[in-house]
Amino acid sequence: MEKRKVRMGIDVGGTYTKCVAMDNETHEIIGKDQVKTTHDDKAGVAAGVVQSFRNCLKNFNIDPSDVVFVAHSTTQATNAFIEGDVANVGIIGIAGGGLEGFLAKRQLRLKDIVLDEKVGRMIKVLNTFIKKKQLTDEVINQNIDELVSQGTDVIVASMAFGVDSMEEEQRIHDLASKKNIPVTMASDITKLYGLTRRTRTAAINASILPKMMATANATESSVRGAGVSVPLMIMRGDGGVMEINEMRKRPILTALSGPAASVMGSLMYLRASNAIYFEVGGTTTNIGVIKNGRPGVDYAKIGGHDTYINSLDVRILGCAGGSMVRISDKDVVDVGPRSAHIAGCEYACFTPEEEIVNPQIELVSPKKGDPADYCVIRLQNGKKICFTNTCAANVLGLVDEKYFAHGNANSARKAMQPVADKLGITVEELATKILDKDYDKVSSCIKSLAEKYELDHDAMKLVGCGGGAAALVPYCAKKMGLDYDIPQNAEVISSIGVALAMVRDVVERVIPNPSQEDIKELKQEAVDSAINSGADPDSIEVHVEIDAQTGKVTAIATGSTEVKATDLLKECDENEATKLVTKDFGKDVTDIKLSIKNDKFFVFEATKKGKNSVRIVDRKGFIKVQCSNAFVTKCKIENYKEVVEQLWEEQAEFRTDSVIRPDYFVCYGPRISDYSAIDLEQIYLLMDLDLGDRDKQEEIIIVASI
């Protein structure tokens, strides 16, 4: 019998560390385990990672040699910033002479980086500067020794225009490494201009290097000790994974990897290709975006400082499953941000009904400095409970029995009755007021994300994960007129995301009017980075984006740690694909038809609100593209330029002050690439990079979307 192959994903949350083991071929869950997150252990959260991993191996009889992939997300970097557990950073700045040197010296000189003003947490920064022509080994060593004598733990090498030539930074790196001092090169972290921001990003990275290297070593040796020999991968904040050796150089990339894990779970496991994604915990709700199979990404802010680190664009709201309710004599004032957990109270809907006798209102401030209008209910037996969002949703009958948030609606009613009486309304009206307060926060967040990422309301749906999902998602979806989905295994979706994550690397440069050669070089650089991060060369795909306004060109390489000879994920047939798109097209749709199919894709069209709506489904049942107004055609590669030009003119929308040109999706082989640019030549440039080397007689599918 052929040995099974197992993927293991471990997600480190604020309260629990959860491990999931999945079948590599079918993605079925073999087993799951959770332990309390080990914040206070001397090995930090790594202890919990290893514990849950070993439990999973033992409890589900997994042979360590069957494990082909093991990865974990980490809160270690984020916690280090929050708790101020950071090293002192010494910056060695380098620049030429004259005016350039004078300006660069000022830009390179960083002050201490404040992480939390209230409690005075900061990264201590020491500075030194070397003129480029004085850069000798002797001078570099003198500067390193001087910084170390002043208390430096870790070095940053940063040069003006260092992204164009890394030799000087590399020289400092090599000499510091010989002295066993951890070192970061600024142009290794990002290839973007902006000397101060690049140096600051490198300094923030350097500040957590010693701590993260110790954690990496502890985790790796424990995983090796369990008999697993495959590389240990770490989740990045942008939703990819990288090998632990890469993490030792660039630990800052792992900041915010918790929210990233849950978005990737939605993307890979739920096949969500266009969705607003919710992870509803007890205290906070993370909201992010998936558009055409890609999560929304932005630069991370750390301690309020802008960096050049890509992370998933996730908004964090202080209203969740366990949020407490604030009241006045006349109305519901607000819901959250404090949760029942903080006040040390049980949820009313999880309290036995018979205990709720003679409930009395008490108004408290859960933490010092909080307003004293948070509502707690004192029972006759002396116990204090809270009614929360989860209780309100149960009262309104919105939580199906199968969901984690399902509780006793009668218990919640009894606890809410005194407050309803005080406000002169029914319990149902009180529950509605509570959820309306959440809806105001959630809907404005969804609207701003939809605007930023140009999401089409008709194609949007809400995907709810986390234990508290059923408390908020059904209510908000109904009020916004959107479909929603709360999947099976929603409470371990983050661990699933880690287990299924791909290797990812991003290279960005500022290149005004890039040539085909420039983009080829950038693509190759992204491929090399992904290989260094652990991707198999044959599995790598590269997506290129050009920002015409800033001249920034971004190459995003994704790949897996192995190439699968056969993929046993169930093939999706025409019948199943039709069902998927019929559900996805939603209401008010007519004339659904399969307009093009080949051995890799199904392309469906339908009429909705007078427009031609399009969906592209791959053979695994992923809806890869959703367009609310588009035109579909097919042609041979030798003719693609004429077709693209024709659609460029025919599909253009002329408005009083501008012309809206189409974006293109092209299906070639097993891939779909999307192209958007403000001029046709740039579109050709990008398409030619993908199609230029393929057989001119190959048939491709082109979708032009407005």
PLM-predicted stretches and their roles:
Residues 2-706:
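N-terminally biased helix-coil "hinge/interface" segments that flank
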